Each structure stands twice: as structure tokens, then as C-alpha cells.
């Protein structure tokens, strides 16, 4: 079945809202944080049963083991042993971000042009790119992207779009926006020929240009997409991103769920949720964990610091994650990182992912009380 979005409460203080997205594999309480399982797995975490929605990357699964192989094994849910909702992207994000730099990198002011090492050629038909695994030259069109996502079998899928960096010149920027909406329309048409249990979000582009964002919203809302995703360049810092998201959501109707693509660090979530964003995806908590940055209510903990060498307390006394309930001390976790024990990233990732889910629960409770 296509997803159903239920609005439970609209805050009286802002555009923040609490809702539920109903899919054939379960219900997602919103606002929700969506961890990224790049290759169909969360790095350092085996059990993802308590995570309501998981984001898998079509690009990486396209290169290995291949969507057809996954389809023969029953689709991603059976392949991964997951009986809860999954969202996949189009593959375009990785193609273009490997060439240009990602949206998150731009927000951190390091979105410098990388060159075209992976991206070979863009035409109106699609994108040619080189596999980072073996150098093969591959082609991805809107139809091929959707078919790959059909084979993977995710609950929510994304149409092919072109991700542009902040530094693009105006002429190419406008050309790209137009081409992206043609690609999205082709993607939607292909999807609707065989919708199965899947739903498709339309992606809104437009960079920092309010008029182009308005055009993007109008395009997505005029087409029968099941949800809206805010994509494209979001600026170079949190302030610019806030302006982009505020402008974009001001044009959106309230009937569909709204996802913010590629953004999911805590400062951004706190800043964006008031604009009515329903879900955020990011590899932030697991990536931070692998680098020894531990999330806690009192603020991030850089576990490698000397001051934790004799700290026998758990990461967060109020936390109910497996790491904290197992009595893993800060001193022990620091030791594991210092000796490069693989368990360090595992314990840290389990905690960080649980922390993100708890933060989202607290955000939903605050919205219900009209505190956000």
C-alpha cells in the first residue's frame, strides 16, 4: 500500500507537528531521525529493530550485490532481516556528491569542488559515472533508478535528481533544475506503472533562490507524489539552511510528510523541526561514534580526552541503551578507542543511535505540549 500520513498535533508555537507515517512494514512516529545504512547495514550495529525508519543507498547497493540479486533474495527487508520501514535514495546523491561534495559538507563550509573523478557525463537521458569499486562506466536514468529501487523493495523511494553544489553558476543552475524536474516526472511515471507497496517522495530543488524553491514546491505538489523531500544545495552554514528550509516549507501544503535530505545532526534538527520537517536522514551518529564523539544529554563527549581515563561512570546515567545498561564506563570506552579495539565503535554507535531516538521522542513530546 502507499503510505498514509496522519497529522496528530500541530504546534501552536511554530510549524512543528507530530504525526505518523503508515507503511506496509510499520508505522513511523514523526518527527523522526532516520539513520543511514549505506550498504544495507548500520556500521557497528547488528540490531536495528528499534529504529522506525532506515535509509539505504541505492548507489552502493547498485554496485554490490546489485538490485537484481537483492530482488532474488526477497528484497531488502528479507535480505537484511528487517521487518520495519526502509527508504532508499535514487543513487543520484552519491554520483553527484562524490564529484562535487555533499550537502552536509557544504553546511560545514567545506564543499569545495572535488572535480569530476566519478561523474563522467550528464545528459538529458541520465548520468554516466564510474564505479568506485572497479572503474566500470555505468549509466543511471530515471527509469533505471526507479527499477533498481523496485528490485530493492523499499517502502519509500526517491526519484532521480541532480545534486548541485553551492558554487554552480546561474545558467547551469537553472538548466539543472529544469532537467531534474523532467527526471522526477519520468521517475514518477515509471513508478506509477507498477507501484506495488511503495511510495515516492518528490524532491524540491532551487538552491538559495526563493523563486526557484517556490517553483520546485509547485512542481512537486502538482504531481501525485506521496511526500515531499527538500533537497539540493542548502547553503554554506546553518543560518543559510534555516532560511532555505523556512522559505521552502512556507510554500508547502500540510497534507504530505516532509523529509529533509542528508541533514540529521542535532543542531540542525533542533533548528529545522520548527519549520514542520517530519524526518531527517544522516550518518552523523554512527560516523561520530566511530571517531570517538559520544552524544549525551549534557553535550557531546570526546571520549579520547585524558580526563575520562579514570572516569568509572557510564556515558549517561539516564540512558537505557545496551551500552549504558551493560555498565560500559567512560574509562573503559576510552581504553577501547585508544587500543583501536573494534568493540569501541560498536558500543559507541549503539549508544549514539539510541540517544538520537530518545531526542526525537523528547521533541515529539515537546511539540505535543506546544513547547516547540
Curated annotation (Swiss-Prot):
Belongs to the queuine tRNA-ribosyltransferase family. GO terms for biological process: queuosine biosynthetic process; tRNA-guanine transglycosylation. Binds 1 zinc ion per subunit. Its cofactor is Zn(2+). One of its GO terms (molecular function) is metal ion binding. Zn(2+) binds at residues 319, 321, 324, 351. Catalyzes the base-exchange of a guanine (G) residue with the queuine precursor 7-aminomethyl-7-deazaguanine (PreQ1) at position 34 (anticodon wobble position) in tRNAs with GU(N) anticodons (tRNA-Asp, -Asn, -His and -Tyr). Catalysis occurs through a double-displacement mechanism. The nucleophile active site attacks the C1' of nucleotide 34 to detach the guanine base from the RNA, forming a covalent enzyme-RNA intermediate. The proton acceptor active site deprotonates the incoming PreQ1, allowing a nucleophilic attack on the C1' of the ribose to form the product. It is an enzyme of class 2 (transferase). Homodimer. Within each dimer, one monomer is responsible for RNA recognition and catalysis, while the other monomer binds to the replacement base PreQ1. It comes from the Bacteria. This is Queuine tRNA-ribosyltransferase. Residues 262-268, 286-290 are annotated as: RNA binding. It catalyses: 7-aminomethyl-7-carbaguanine + guanosine(34) in tRNA = 7-aminomethyl-7-carbaguanosine(34) in tRNA + guanine. The lineage of its organism: Bacteria, Pseudomonadati, Chlamydiota, Chlamydiia, Chlamydiales. Its EC number is 2.4.2.29. Pathway: tRNA modification; tRNA-queuosine biosynthesis. The active site is at residues 89, 281. PANTHER family: PTHR43468, TRNA-GUANOSINE(34) QUEUINE TRANSGLYCOSYLASE. Keywords: Glycosyltransferase, Metal-binding, Queuosine biosynthesis, Transferase, tRNA processing, Zinc. The keyword Metal-binding applies. Substrate binds at residues 89-93, 161, 232.
Amino acid at each position: 500500500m502507499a503510505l498514509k500520513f496522519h497529522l496528530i498535533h500541530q504546534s501552536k508555537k511554530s510549524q512543528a507537528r507530530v504525526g505518523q507515517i503508515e507503511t506496509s512494514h510499520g508505522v513511523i512516529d514523526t518527527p523522526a531521525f532516520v539513520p543511514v545504512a549505506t550498504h544495507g547495514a548500520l556500521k557497528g550495529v547488528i540490531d536495528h529493530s528499534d529504529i522506525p525508519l532506515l535509509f539505504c543507498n541505492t548507489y552502493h547497493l547498485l554496485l554490490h550485490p546489485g538490485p537484481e540479486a537483492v530482488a532474488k533474495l526477497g528484497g531488502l527487508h528479507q535480505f537484511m532481516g528487517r521487518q520495519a520501514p526502509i527508504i532508499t535514495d535514487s543513487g543520484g546523491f552519491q554520483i553527484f556528491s562524490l564529484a562535487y561534495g555533499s550537502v552536509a559538507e557544504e553546511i560545514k563550509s567545506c564543499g569545495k569542488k572535488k572535480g569530476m573523478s566519478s561523474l563522467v557525463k550528464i545528459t538529458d537521458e541520465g548520468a554516466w559515472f564510474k564505479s568506485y569499486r572497479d572503474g566500470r562506466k555505468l549509466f543511471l536514468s530515471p527509469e533505471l533508478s526507479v527499477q533498481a529501487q523496485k528490485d530493492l523493495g523499499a517502502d519509500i523511494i526517491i526519484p532521480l535528481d541532480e545534486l548541485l553544489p553551492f558554487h554552480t553558476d546561474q545558467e547551469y543552475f537553472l538548466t539543472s533544475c529544469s532537467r531534474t524536474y523532467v527526471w522526477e516526472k519520468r521517475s514518477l511515471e515509471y513508478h506509477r506503472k507498477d507501484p506495488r507497496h511503495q511510495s515516492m517522495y518528490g524532491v524540491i530543488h532551487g538552491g538559495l533562490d526563493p523563486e526557484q524553491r517556490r517553483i520546485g514546491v509547485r512542481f512537486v505538489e502538482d504531481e501525485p507524489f506521496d511526500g515531499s523531500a527538500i533537497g539540493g544545495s542548502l547553503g554554506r552554514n546553518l543560518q543559510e539552511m534555516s532560511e532555505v528550509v523556512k522559505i521552502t516549507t512556507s510554500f508547502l501544503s500540510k497534507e504530505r510528510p516532509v523529509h529533509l535530505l542528508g541533514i540529521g545532526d542535532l543542531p540542525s534538527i533542533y533548528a529545522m523541526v520548527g519549520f514542520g520537517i517530519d524526518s531527517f536522514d544522516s550518518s552523523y551518529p554512527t560516523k561520530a561514534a566511530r571517531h570517538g564523539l559520544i552524544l549525551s544529554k549534557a553535550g557531546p563527549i570526546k571520549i579520547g580526552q585524558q580526563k575520562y581515563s579514570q572516569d568509572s561512570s557510564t556515558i549517561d546515567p539516564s540512558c537505557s541503551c545496551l551500552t549504558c545498561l551493560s555498565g560500559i564506563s567512560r574509562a573503559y570506552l576510552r581504553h577501547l578507542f585508544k587500543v583501536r579495539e573494534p568493540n569501541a565503535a560498536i558500543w559507541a554507535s549503539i549508544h549514539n543511535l539510541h540517544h538520537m531516538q530518545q531526542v526525537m521522542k523528547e521533541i515529539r513530546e515537546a511539540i505535543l505540549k506546544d513547547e516547540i
